[in-house]
Structure formats: C-alpha cells, structure tokens
C-alpha cells in the first residue's frame, strides 16, 4: 500500500491505470497479495491489476480474488513453450497478454552472432541462452528467421513482432530499446501482412522448445514463472 502511495506521489497523479505485481512472491500466497492490491482499486488509487512472471495456476488463483487485466510474461519465437501455456490461460480468463522481451533481448534481431557482439559488462553475457552451444543453436534459429524476413522485405525484428501480433488482438508486446530508430523500425511491424503460409513457415522455423538455454542464470530462474 505504501509503495503505491509513493508511486502516485512520484508520478504526480491521483490514480494508476494498471498496477503490476512485477514478480510473484514465493513466500506470500497470491491470494494475499492480490487481496491487498484489490483494496487499492476499492480506494480509487488503481484502475486495473496485473501480474508478471506468473504461471497459469497462479494467474487463475489471482483472478478468483480480483479480475486480472494483464499478465506480463516473456513470450517470443525464442521462448514459446511457457509463453503459449500462459496465453492459453489468459484467453480462458479474458486477460490481455503483454509479452516482454519479444525480440529475445536482441537475439531475434539478427544483430547477435557471437559473444563478441555484446559489450563488455552486458548482463546478457550471464544468460545461458547467450553462451556456448546454446548461443550457436539460437543463432542458427535466427538465420532461418532472417531468410523469411528477406523474402518479406523487412527486418528480422519486424517479422518477429508481426508474427507475435498475428497471434491475436489480446497480445500487446512491449519491445524495449534505447534508440529512437529502433522504435521507428518496430512500429513498421504494424504494416506487415503475414499470410497463413507465412505464419506456418515462421512457426516451423522456430517451433516451441527450439530456443536453447534458460532466460536467466540459475538463481534468477528460481524467482520467475511462479
């Protein structure tokens, strides 16, 4: 409750449109957490509630306490299996899925071909998907995506985002970037029209489970998708 009050003060607003529990607390029942967040809605401080890095069972339990408007989980062509498990649950409950890292932390843009493409100190160097054989496997996957992107006359990033958007209107990806030119590039994905055959080829190029390596280091993985 105090955290919400502090956020309202920092933002200089009276109400927050969407308030997330950004990581599920393994030591606190989700019913207790959402129960407290529900009171924020009742007090008029928050309009809607969201979860992040929550597994389907947790989402369902939370939704029984108060309607969940959005779930922010990782979902991309590099990380499909759990993303699609989440999507099944959110669709059952009428919840919007907000995929973060839809470009696989740049892996799916075709700009990462080896460790040398990441600057010294980049935290991605600690992520297993950017290491050793897993990196080689993922680079090979991206090359298949790049081939289709060339045929569609777009960048790999645009193709990947267009594929994600084509999965349904209840999906709102949030790609992150530090550069305006990347924002402009990503927005162009809205103009790309993919045929059923295109979608099939893209899906086959990066089927569920094809991405190698975990999303985070082992210790961090213990605190996500709970």
What are these regions (language model features)?
Residues 1-10, 55-59:
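Short, acidic/polar
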Residues 214-219:
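Short coil/turn segments at secondary-structure boundaries
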Residues 24, 28-204, 209, 221-226:
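Beta/alpha (TIM)-barrel catalytic core signal, keyed to glycine-rich beta->alpha loops juxtaposed to Asp/Glu
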Residues 8-25:
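Active-site groove signature of glycoside hydrolases
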């Amino acid at each position: 409750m105090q955290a919400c009050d502090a956020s309202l003060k920092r933002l200089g607003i009276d109400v927050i449109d969407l308030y997330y529990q950004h990581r599920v607390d393994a030591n606190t029942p989700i019913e207790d957490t959402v129960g407290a967040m529900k009171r924020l809605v009742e007090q008029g401080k928050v309009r809607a509630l969201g979860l992040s890095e929550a597994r389907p069972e947790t989402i369902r339990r939370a939704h029984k306490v108060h309607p969940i408007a959005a779930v922010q989980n990782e979902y991309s062509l590099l990380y499909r299996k759990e993303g699609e498990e989440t999507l099944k649950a959110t669709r059952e409950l009428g919840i919007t899925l907000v995929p973060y890292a839809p470009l696989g932390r740049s892996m799916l843009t075709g700009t990462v071909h080896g460790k040398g493409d990441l600057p010294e100190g980049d935290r991605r160097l600690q992520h297993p998907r950017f290491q050793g054989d897993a990196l080689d496997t993922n680079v090979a996957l991206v090359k298949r995506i790049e081939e289709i992107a060339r045929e569609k006359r777009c960048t790999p990033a645009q193709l990947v985002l267009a594929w994600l958007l084509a999965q349904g209107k209840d999906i709102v990806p949030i790609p992150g970037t530090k550069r305006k030119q990347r924002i402009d590039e990503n927005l162009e994905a809205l103009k790309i029209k993919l045929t059923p055959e295109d979608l099939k080829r893209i899906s086959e190029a990066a089927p569920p489970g094809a991405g190698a390596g975990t999303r985070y280091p082992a210790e961090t993985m213990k605190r996500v998708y709970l």
